[in-house]
Amino acid sequence: MENSTEVTEFILLGLTDDPNLQIPLLLAFLFIYLITLLGNGGMMVIIHSDSHLHTPMYFFLSNLSLVDLGYSSAVAPKTVAALRSGDKAISYDGCAAQFFFFVGFATVECYLLASMAYDRHAAVCRPLHYTTTMTAGVCALLATGSYVSGFLNASIHAAGTFRLSFCGSNEINHFFCDIPPLLALSCSDTRISKLVVFVAGFNVFFTLLVILISYFFICITIQRMHSAEGQKKVFSTCASHLTALSIFYGTIIFMYLQPNSSQSVDTDKIASVFYTVVIPMLNPLIYSLRNKEVKSALWKILNKLYPQY
């Protein structure tokens, strides 16, 4: 990847330069990141340790937890370190690495959410063929395809962004290396890079289309059910996934459909906090609080660890 940049490091300006907010932000980011590690790590352990959870739905959920750890870890540790030390510098290579892993894991999440929607469609709309549709091979293929597509997309984004020259200011008006502030910082012609980023962004719309089509057929199937109890049961199995989908895609759409302005930059930062650190923390809570199987598996683990209680 050819690069003629004179910049060797960037300065991440962060969420705010108000010194009175640095400690509260540090504590908030640290707390959320620790909960993210505990929640997603715990979810993977629970699913791995209970044979009853070795199903396609929980296979994708364990991968989702891994991905949430990945893209949260691409951003949160550096942000916490900068808030703690006051050192806002990040090397050129460090910025490129953060950018690559964040975009990669975020795109993988899109594909995993689409795979989970397809799994729910197969379970609700074709229950008699579910075991032959969602085989171990199909699940592995969908998961592998998600990771390959995600990091291929990240490679295209990184190539389109870091081939540019950064020969002026090195101050990124953000708390991590994201696409819009980096393109705004470049002193090169960014039209081709913006086009590449736009085309590569088709991943988000493709996965959203798969999700919408899957849930369209799920809704039709629910409407055809004569039993209110059956409708309630089907809806409850999809409720957690729908909640996670709404939060994730709602935040992305809100961010990238805003007009460019000084106010939208600050709004983008707040939205970025939500989808970089808050959503990875919320996902294990969303999928476990209303899930009897996960809660049952958790109690089994706790009973083994602390039988006296």
Curated annotation (Swiss-Prot):
Keywords: Cell membrane, Disulfide bond, G-protein coupled receptor, Glycoprotein, Membrane, Olfaction, Receptor, Sensory transduction, Transducer, Transmembrane, Transmembrane helix
Top-rank taxon: Eukaryota
InterPro entries: GPCR_Rhodpsn, GPCR_Rhodpsn_7TM, Olfact_rcpt
Glycosylation sites: 3, 260
Biological-process GO terms, alphabetical: G protein-coupled receptor signaling pathway; sensory perception of smell
Gene3D superfamilies registered for this protein in UniProt: Rhodopsin 7-helix transmembrane proteins
Extracellular side: 1-26, 77-95, 159-199, 257-270
Cytoplasmic face of the membrane: 48-55, 117-137, 221-235, 292-309
Membrane topology value: Multi-pass membrane protein
SUPFAM superfamilies for this protein: Family A G protein-coupled receptor-like
Pfam families registered for this protein in UniProt: 7tm_4
Transmembrane feature ranges: 27-47, 56-76, 96-116, 138-158, 200-220, 236-256, 271-291
The keyword Transmembrane appears for this protein: yes
GO molecular function: G protein-coupled receptor activity; odorant binding; olfactory receptor activity
Disulphide-bridged cysteine pairs: 95-177
Cellular component GO terms held in the UniProt record: plasma membrane
Subcellular location: Cell membrane
Record-stated family: Belongs to the G-protein coupled receptor 1 family.
Described function: Odorant receptor.
Name this protein carries in UniProt: Olfactory receptor 5B21
Gene coding for it: OR5B21
